[in-house]
């Protein structure tokens, strides 16, 4: 019971993201379901682990597309709370963030944002093309209780398969930069971003440097060097 009291004291800081107390109540129950469930059966696992009746199933579903939850405000509350709950790993005065993309296979025929995706890192266990969601995520590097470092997820968004405007010509790199800036502006701190070689691009580096942030990554192998032709 002591653990749940501490848990609730933490979750209450997310209250500004909900327009009504009832909406916040169902969000708390949803978070409880995520923390306690023993299987990955979706909303059904929430109903099962919380010992609710079947009527609660649709209540949980309504929360995920409810206008009573402000996603941007919820993300800002969580990003701000992470600096209180955890001891962030720093390089100088900079917070260290990790960024990566993931393609999650989905089989739902009518599931929103599912599209035909190409996986650059195909292997024997990963097909080259899949149907699924393409997401990009940012985490905060923190000190663990045992002296190790851990990554705390901050935010994640589906960046392919959703078209809000035909005039939106942003690439995945541009969308990741915007996602990072939405996190950094909440902290009002400079960030050191660590990412793989896919993000070693001018579209990432230039906006970061303009805002005072930095990128640590592996250089791509597509650079070309040459010597001038000697005079004969």
Question: Model regions: which residues?
Answer:
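Gly/serine-rich nucleotide phosphate-binding loop at the start of the catalytic core
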Residues: 1-65, 71-78
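A short, flexible helix-boundary coil/loop motif
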Residues: 1-26, 34, 143-162, 168-173, ...
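Gly/Ser/Thr-rich loops at beta-strand to alpha-helix junctions
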Residues: 37, 103-105, 197-201
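Electropositive, glycine- and tryptophan-enriched low-complexity nucleic-acid-binding patches
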Residues: 53-62, 67, 121-190
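An internal, acidic/charged active-site-proximal segment
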Residues: 161-232
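Active-site-proximal, Lys/Arg-enriched surface segment
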Residues: 66-148
């Amino acid at each position: 019971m002591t653990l749940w009291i501490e848990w609730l004291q933490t979750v209450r800081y997310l209250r500004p993201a909900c327009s009504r107390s009832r909406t916040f109540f169902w969000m708390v129950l949803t978070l409880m379901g995520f923390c306690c469930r023993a299987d990955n059966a979706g909303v059904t696992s929430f109903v099962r682990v919380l010992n609710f009746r079947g009527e609660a199933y649709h209540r949980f579903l309504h929360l995920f597309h409810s206008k009573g939850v402000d996603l941007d405000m919820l993300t800002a509350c969580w990003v701000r709370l992470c600096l209180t709950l955890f001891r962030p790993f720093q390089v100088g005065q900079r917070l260290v963030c990790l960024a990566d993309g993931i393609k999650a296979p989905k089989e739902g025929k009518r599931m929103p944002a599912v599209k035909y995706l190409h996986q650059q890192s195909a292997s024997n266990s990963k097909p080259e093309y899949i149907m699924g969601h393409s997401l990009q995520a940012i985490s905060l590097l923190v000190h663990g209780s045992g002296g190790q470092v851990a990554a705390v997820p901050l935010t994640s968004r589906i960046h392919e398969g959703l078209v809000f405007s035909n005039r939106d010509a942003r690439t995945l790199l541009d969308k990741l930069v915007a996602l990072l800036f939405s996190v950094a502006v909440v902290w009002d701190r400079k960030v050191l971003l660590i990412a793989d070689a896919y993000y070693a691009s001018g579209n990432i580096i230039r906006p970061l440097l303009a805002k005072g942030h930095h990128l640590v990554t592996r250089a791509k192998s597509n650079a070309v060097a040459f010597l001038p032709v000697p005079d004969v």
